[in-house]
Amino acid sequence: MEIAPGIHRIEGDLGERYVCQYLLAGEERTLLVDTGLRDMPEQVIAPYLATLGRSLADLDDVLISHADVDHCGGNRALRAAAPDARLLCGEADRAWIESNDLMLAENYLWYEPYGCGPSPDDVDFLARELGGDAPVDVGLTGGETLRLSSDWRVEVLALPGHTPGHVGLWDPRSRAAVIIDAALADGVCDRAGNRLIPPRYYSAAGYEATIRRLGALDPAVLLTAHYDVMEREAARAFLDRSLAFVHAVRDATDANVQAGTTALWPLTQAVDAAVGPFSAFTHELAASVRSHLARV
């Protein structure tokens, strides 16, 4: 679906919810944002490109927004189908994105010593859907400009918080912000609108600064991975909810620490009761809680 001139949203199934990639098709270069799960390049992205008379081999640049399985699991398959495309990502996420083992250990399994973490079935899913190692060509820090046409350039946005090196795009031509998971309101929902997964952020300060930066941009269109397309007023409300959630987690963390709960998993469960409850991946809230403990 074309959202703005040259900007297309590609939607694929992710269990009870969906995940989106974005295609920016210029006259000179074509840019894909994210590769999805392991098989999504061939099963989801390629069929959409075919409707435009294009193929994966026509891609010039592939920007990985951040290190999560549903955003970079298709990297190896994409590399095989588009060997000439440049693979770009935020430099701070590069090590995770390039190494499945490192991603699994440091992004998904670090919870285990605290008594929580993904189930064995979820670990199997993650290991399978990460799709195999793939090298990144260019690490980004934000502020870079990508030229798509003689009159169309987009800016890389550094959007840390959800992950250290999360990046997005700002298109001044349409005032569209491609933010993927840089802000997550008060939770990720299923297709029916039921909250499932808590917003995870590794840096509360970084995540809050990112939300405020996006608000200051005042985008006409806000484009995420797991939510509907939002225009100006809806985008503002979404960012407000994202900020309010950070403050709610902070306040619940502080209150429970002051009451004597300091171990990470019991503390996370108490915070979940205050701001949730969330029915899936509740352990990911531990990352957000831990990021607030640094200031307690």
Language model regions located:
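Metallo-beta-lactamase
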Residues: 30, 37-39, 145, 153-238, ...
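Active-site HxH/HxHxD metal-binding segment of metal-dependent hydrolases
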Residues: 37-42, 50-147
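A generic structural signal for alpha->beta connector loops
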Residues: 6, 84, 136-137, 153, ...
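C-terminal regulatory/interaction regions
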Residues: 251-296
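Divalent metal-coordination and catalytic microenvironments
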Residues: 6, 24, 34, 66, ...
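Residues at alpha-helix caps and immediate loop-helix transition turns in enzyme cores, especially N-
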Residues: 44-45, 74, 234-238
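Conserved beta-strand hairpin/beta-sheet module of binuclear metal-dependent hydrolase folds
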Residues: 1-52, 169-182
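Short Pro/Gly-enriched beta-strand edge/turn motifs at strand-loop
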Residues: 2-8, 123-129, 149-154
